[in-house]
Amino acid sequence: MLARSVGLAYAAANRRDFDSVLVGWDPGGQYHPSGDLLPPDLETVFYGHDGYLELWRYWLDAFADIRWDPEEILDFGDRLLVTTQQRGRGSGSGVAVSEPVFQLFTLRRGLVVRQEDFLDRSKALEAAALPTLSGPVSRGQVR
């Protein structure tokens, strides 16, 4: 069930159906993209639905066909770590980009209240605070 829901959210984002994506986002949510993926003059934290859309506008300007394809989900209860493959082609350069991005989602009342993106899996796992978790971790493949 979880893998299906996550897959549907990524599919909606990849087809630019942001109204569907934002149904799962808290209006006061925060998006912390990896600084390695942003130019230095862009904000480092994006707030609320407007901030989420602002960051997507940046991605769509920079990459004609940017997408994130989810490959694995680690479920830690109130946090999900989704391994994705970011793909796109530079709008101006035409250079193809494909790299793993690890997206950590914090959930409250079933809504995303925080998203953090990492290029380093170990840093993403550290941010998920794995040592403080109790109970099993559920692993799922996205279909």
Q: Language model features by range: what are they?
A:
Residues 1, 59-143:
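A beta-strand edge to alpha-helix "cap/lid" segment located at domain peripheries
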Residues 4, 18-78:
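A solvent-exposed, acidic/Ser-Thr-rich amphipathic alpha-helical stretch
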Residues 1-10:
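Extreme N-terminal tail/first-helix region
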Residues 9, 21-22, 29, 48, ...:
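Hydrophobic pocket/interface hotspot
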